Amino acid sequence: MATSASSHLNKGIKQMYMSLPQGEKVQAMYIWVDGTGEGLRCKTRTLDCEPKCVEELPEWNFDGSSTFQSEGSNSDMYLSPVAMFRDPFRKEPNKLVFCEVFKYNRKPAETNLRHSCKRIMDMVSNQHPWFGMEQEYTLMGTDGHPFGWPSNGFPGPQGPYYCGVGADKAYGRDIVEAHYRACLYAGVKITGTNAEVMPAQWEFQIGPCEGIRMGDHLWVARFILHRVCEDFGVIATFDPKPIPGNWNGAGCHTNFSTKAMREENGLKYIEEAIDKLSKRHQYHIRAYDPKGGLDNARRLTGFHETSNINDFSAGVANRGASIRIPRTVGQEKRGYFEDRRPSANCDPYAVTEAIVRTCLLNETGNEPFQYKN
């Protein structure tokens, strides 16, 4: 399996420099979503002192013509800090800074989906929407070959790998453990991890997060994963169907509840929300991957624990349905439901906004409603 040249550099030499004192200065790594709607970019600046909150962080700029976000003739774009985390790579007092992107005219960039999501979340803040997202991903060599797979063939059939233990079942656990600890250090709300059904496929869970924070924490968790994989010389892909054939795809199952759903007899509100979702299936399919449903078409086949992309379905404990009500929720008659349709490479802001629009703002039809200021 091919690994990156950088992973073969002597890390001990790097550590000699990283252990040097930095005085009162702080390194802040600014992170943003690029013009693909999937890729992340970052760059670092020096601050004179440690910021205590995100409001103390300065705005910055970058060359949007090199990130698929603007033309070269008018390429300056703005980075507006919206979330701050501890930096697990440089350690305290250094920071990771997640940013929204704005164009030269101060309008949000096309892939800045956080801007509209924040507005929608503010409209329903009194209902306290909680989200939890289950991020699946696949580890690959730099040659695009799945990590740990035979160079001239395939591993044994699916079955022993889900939550598997042992060198012949768990491929890449060191990366998973490093990512988990780095997220905890950063302050990302990571709640668990497990090996998935396909070998070299893993999952981590983020949440519960209220409102806009769901997207903030998931994007930063993805960034940390990419950086950890960079150190190990491998790639983490969020492609929803990285290997064709009889192998599971990768999703980002999204769990959702409101205060009313979590309280006694909340199942009534869960069922009402599912009924609303059933009448707006195609709108959600378009929102649930960056290519308007084309990526998910490779994954949502009705096989490998997925629903069919053309049909809406719901059921208790049914992993072949669009919407799953966990068995414990059915028994306790309160809790949350799981939307199993979002793809692994979805934008969490698009997913959570769509759910709120349909379930809480009672929107119908195939287009989002345009609210006045």
Swiss-Prot record:
**Residue numbers of N6-acetyllysine PTMs:** 11, 14
The chain positions of domain GS beta-grasp read: 24-106
Record PTM Phosphoserine, positions in chain = 343
Pfam families per record: Gln-synt_C (PF00120), Gln-synt_N (PF03951)
Asked if the record carries the keyword DNA-binding, the reply is no
Q: How is it modified after translation?
A: Palmitoylated; undergoes autopalmitoylation.
Could you tell me the EC number(s) of this protein?
Answer: 6.3.1.2, 2.3.1.225
> Residues that bind L-glutamate, according to the entry?
246-247, 319, 340
Q: Please cite one Gene Ontology biological process associated with this protein.
A: glutamine biosynthetic process
List the Gene Ontology MF annotations in alphabetical order. ATP binding; glutamine synthetase activity; metal ion binding; protein-cysteine S-palmitoyltransferase activity
So where does Mn(2+) 1 get bound? 134, 253, 338
| Record localization | Cytoplasm, Cytosol; Microsome; Mitochondrion; Cell membrane
List GO terms (cellular component aspect): cytosol; endoplasmic reticulum; mitochondrion; plasma membrane
The cross-references to PROSITE patterns, in alphabetical order and at most eight, read: GLNA_1, GLNA_ATP, GS_BETA_GRASP, GS_CATALYTIC
Q: Which InterPro entries match?
A: Gln_synt_N (IPR008147), Gln_synt_N_sf (IPR036651), Gln_synth/guanido_kin_cat_dom (IPR014746), Gln_synth_cat_dom (IPR008146), Gln_synth_gly_rich_site (IPR027303), Gln_synth_N_conserv_site (IPR027302), Glutamine_Synthetase (IPR050292)
Which residues bind ATP per the record? 134, 203-208, 255-257, 319, 324
Task: Enumerate the UniProt keywords alphabetically.
Answer: Acetylation, Angiogenesis, ATP-binding, Cell membrane, Cytoplasm, Endoplasmic reticulum, Ligase, Lipoprotein, Magnesium, Manganese, Membrane, Metal-binding, Microsome, Mitochondrion, Nucleotide-binding, Palmitate, Phosphoprotein, Transferase, Ubl conjugation
Give the sites modified to N-acetylalanine: 2
Region of interest: Required for glutamine-induced ubiquitination by CRL4(CRBN) and proteasomal degradation: 2-25
Q: Which residues bind Mn(2+) 2?
A: 136, 196, 203
Function, as annotated: Glutamine synthetase that catalyzes the ATP-dependent conversion of glutamate and ammonia to glutamine. Its role depends on tissue localization: in the brain, it regulates the levels of toxic ammonia and converts neurotoxic glutamate to harmless glutamine, whereas in the liver, it is one of the enzymes responsible for the removal of ammonia.
| Entry similarity comment | Belongs to the glutamine synthetase family.
- Name of the protein described by the UniProt record: Glutamine synthetase
Which species?
Acomys cahirinus
Q: Which gene encodes it?
A: GLUL
